[in-house]
Amino acid sequence: TILWCYARNNGFKVDGVDYHSAADLTGQANHLGVTLQADIIKQKIPTNNGGYNATKHGKTHPKVYSELTTDHPIDLCRFQVANCYMGRIPLINSGGESKGASDLADAVKTAVINKRAGGMGLIAGRKAFQRPWKEGLALVNSIQHVYLEPRVTVA
């Protein structure tokens, strides 16, 4: 079973900042998915952290933010992997909506972040399928190359 563990709540937007993809909130969603015995967790790539503090929910110790994570994209994604029982349950990140010319670069960057964080893959549906066949195939092949490249390792 692949479980979409997206955090959705209007309260996750605070002072103009959107925390729907915050590492701490999505990490908790991943943990809940693992607890429900999902075989694979699908999650958005994290874009920030500190959602619990901003929304005034949870009792996360400050050291989680100061010592266990940084704002680096790989560390934020690694926090998601950690909440999947340290990768025992595979994490795949979603590729997001197609934005046009930057899709190839965005998909490769997301794949590198996911792989270096210990994730297991990337779903790039709209980025690949909402374009001409050759372009979509090139995008999928580029993602595959990231995961098959032995020099791209866990950071």
Task: Please state what every model-predicted region is.
Residues 1, 125, 153-155:
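Proteins with a high burden of low-complexity, intrinsically disordered sequence enriched in S/T/G/P/A and R
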Residues 1-92, 104-120, 145, 149:
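Alpha/beta enzyme core
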Residues 45, 95-96, 126:
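Short secondary-structure boundary segments
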Residues 100-104, 122-124, 130-133:
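Short active-site-adjacent structural elements
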Residues 117-118, 129-155:
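C-terminal helical cap(s) of enzyme catalytic domains, especially alpha/beta-barrels
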